[in-house]
Amino acid sequence: GWFSEQIIIAGDSAGGGLAMALCHYLKDHGKQLPCGIVAMSPWTDLAASGESYETNFERDPLFGKTRDSLIYNKDYIGDNDPYNAYISPLYGDFRGFPPMLIQVGSYEMLLSDSVDVAAKAREQGVKVRISIYEGMFHIFQMAAKMLPESKRAWVEIGKFIDVLLND
């Protein structure tokens, strides 16, 4: 088996939000948390309250001008409360969370999700590294070897994991 000190949860977009939501759930139910979280362009605020939903509306090539079909998709939350921490991790209590690496592009509609969750977690005592990659779009890391920023992001993730697992 594996011990929590050997587990890092990672995800991109909704998966990044789910990684945080899972940690809220584990904490709320008295379970061991992983030793770290890697969240790439995480979707943490399904209430879409952040400033970047407006300021980056036309800048993000993945989401630009598609609010109704992608961001405000009721199929994801149904009739549930978008302020529930298991749906929108931003609204949860981060005290006791493991260290987090959050990566986001400056052109993302979800930029505020990352900035706001990093600030809240940091205020609640969590070690958070947020890296905002200038001019990058939602889940730019998927470009792997095609963009220098993507390469840099994966190197950063590798170093973060090395530190967590070798401390």
Regions found by a protein language model. Give the residues of each.
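Alpha/beta-hydrolase superfamily serine-hydrolase fold, recognizing
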Residues: 1-167
